[in-house]
């Protein structure tokens, strides 16, 4: 008797479409809100060095909640977790809209984002199969970057028109994301019945950290993605100061347009990675990571807007090619060991720890009066060296493994 094969689930299923739409509007709100709030604190005459603290409150929420959000994502239906997280984001946006402390409001958005991240990536492994996971990650990253592109531009352009109008549009975006969350079919919890004692949850989380760190592929993903996002968020704030210094432009829109060029490039790079890189060939992405640092140095020395646009598109393409395979690799390794939700929570701890460290250093050197050009050059050189060291470390580890297997 011949066995019947189960029909393949199409990549763009109802569930996937709902997840992608929710992700777009949620990420749109995050990015538009950042630039609208930056314009607000500029209007309120906060010092330049305080700008990174807006993002630092956001990422601190990720770090503090890291031991708990992975278990939350795996203990409940991930669609419901995403809905709850977007509700928190909406509350944070409304707090800023009504004149509340902008740092507190954006930190509340960070709490929502911390809960949202493990669920949004973890759900991909539940609604796709096999090789579709890399393609699904490509769609997720493309949606995210499209949201960064449009959200960043909208935040800056609308803030030049009316800051509180821009903030209100951010709240509307979170409301649309909530509506899309309601279209995600209710899925079974991946790991129900886990204990809810904080000490046990923290112990379980750090156990997951150890398990993933001992896995060579997971370790590569954790280190690579942490370095990338730490550098990426620092570049975003660097552009805010670089534009008036290098280009002589003082509006809110130009830094957001330049950030949008990075987003355009990441869409291209993510698409290329989905076609050219598989889970078995993830290390092909490392040269792109090294070149990111090189391009940052070249970009920092520019004084022409068009060349800046071109270089940032290239920078984004390299970033997309670098990050998408690493994300897919961690989800695959995590799903097989500690659960996709816990794996993404561990990843968030690494990424946001790197962001907090780099933003803190950036704020310090700005306060010390270091030139923004010198900051950009040093930033690019250090990133390229870090990726080069990671690359050499992997080559040496591979040689050791071959020598051990030959004995």
Swiss-Prot record:
It is a multi-pass membrane protein. It is found in: Cell inner membrane. SUPFAM superfamilies: MFS general substrate transporter (SSF103473). It comes from the Bacteria. Its main location: membrane. It holds the Pfam family MFS_1. Keywords: Cell inner membrane, Cell membrane, Lipid transport, Membrane, Transmembrane, Transmembrane helix, Transport. The chain crosses the membrane at residues 18-38, 53-73, 91-111, 139-159, 163-183, 229-249, 257-277, 286-306, 310-330, 343-365, 375-395. One of its GO terms (molecular function) is lysophospholipid:sodium symporter activity. One of its GO terms (cellular component) is plasma membrane. The keyword Transmembrane applies. Catalyzes the facilitated diffusion of 2-acyl-glycero-3-phosphoethanolamine (2-acyl-GPE) into the cell. Belongs to the major facilitator superfamily. LplT (TC 2.A.1.42) family. This is Lysophospholipid transporter LplT. It comes from Pectobacterium carotovorum subsp. carotovorum (strain PC1). The lineage of its organism: Bacteria, Pseudomonadati, Pseudomonadota, Gammaproteobacteria, Enterobacterales. The gene is lplT.
